[in-house]
Amino acid sequence: MADKQRKKVILVGDGAVGSSYAFALVNQGIAQELGIVDLFKEKTQGDAEDLSHALAFTSPKKIYSADYSDASDADLVVLTSGAPQKPGETRLDLVEKNLRITKDVVTKIVASGFKGIFLVAANPVDILTYATWKFSGFPKNRVVGSGTSLDTARFRQALAEKVDVDARSIHAYIMGEHGDSEFAVWSHANVAGVKLEQWFQENDYLNEAEIVELFESVRDAAYSIIAKKGATFYGVAVALARITKAILDDEHAVLPVSVFQDGQYGVSDCYLGQPAVVGAEGVVNPIHIPLNDAEMQKMEASGAQLKAIIDEAFAKEEFASAVKN
């Protein structure tokens, strides 16, 4: 699908995240066609018109207000539609209302004849990625979530500011849920092959308490931003653009995305954030980082928490009746 000369993306959800993602695609010259779908048709028309005025500064692209039927020949459908996270609300608080939205959207996309890749960003992203897989009947690899891509970027940036190294040169991951049960994989965090734990000791950068504080600032970043400005959207939009480029260009890039779990970390039948090779077929190959005992326990706990919520939600007839996988 993604090796056609004209690469087509359909975006469903033209809120703060969706419109920021569309702007990121225009800015970076990603895709040659972008259709925007939302309940508020005039908003999509206005955004398409506004974005088109930036094309003379970037690269040619067809941008338009789309309908679900336009997904029939798309390479990628990106789902940002859903109720936003409010101040004081966790991502998991959004489950039922966003499951209903996801079921409706995915059903309509599949009915169009769409055969490409789903990229899910609406929260709680791991659960909604799982739901997209269940409602679509698609193979696991062709349903991808943004996962811990943003959390990992936040982690690398926070570390970069502490150790005075370009964030792009820091190799470190956040894994698990995109949410409160996520964890930092300190056992593999490194700069130029030097473990960060050793780097901290040799350069007297961070003590144990400061390391904990740094991780907590990463984990709780969304709450801080939401309290100040009502929503997070720029960071996740650029993360989505990066994943989009990897898929459309068949890059085989290693990115921390939401991947189906088949027991590799003691977790099964759910999606969780972990590094994976990403290309034209979606998840080409999950990368199973060998975790230490403490990290493995955190991964299992994160998966168990999400699985319990999934099982409770899909026990309800309105969701169980729509399952295709």
From Swiss-Prot:
Allosterically activated by fructose 1,6-bisphosphate (FBP). One of its GO terms (molecular function) is L-lactate dehydrogenase activity. NAD(+) binds at residues 17, 38, 43, 68, 82-83, 121-123, 146. Beta-D-fructose 1,6-bisphosphate binds at residues 156, 171. One of its GO terms (biological process) is glycolytic process. It is found in: Cytoplasm. Disulfide bonds: none annotated. Keywords: Allosteric enzyme, Cytoplasm, NAD, Oxidoreductase, Phosphoprotein. The modification Phosphotyrosine is found at residue 223. Its EC number is 1.1.1.27. It is an enzyme of class 1 (oxidoreductase). GO terms for cellular component: cytoplasm. The active site is at 178 (proton acceptor). Substrate binds at residues 85, 91, 123-126, 151-154, 232. It catalyses: (S)-lactate + NAD(+) = pyruvate + NADH + H(+). It comes from the Bacteria. Its main location: cytoplasm. Pathway: Fermentation; pyruvate fermentation to lactate; (S)-lactate from pyruvate: step 1/1. InterPro entries: L-lactate/malate_DH, L-lactate_DH, L-lactate_DH_AS, Lactate/malate_DH_C, Lactate/malate_DH_N, Lactate_DH/Glyco_Ohase_4_C, NAD(P)-bd_dom_sf. Catalyzes the conversion of lactate to pyruvate. Belongs to the LDH/MDH superfamily. LDH family. Homotetramer. This is L-lactate dehydrogenase 1. The gene is ldh1.
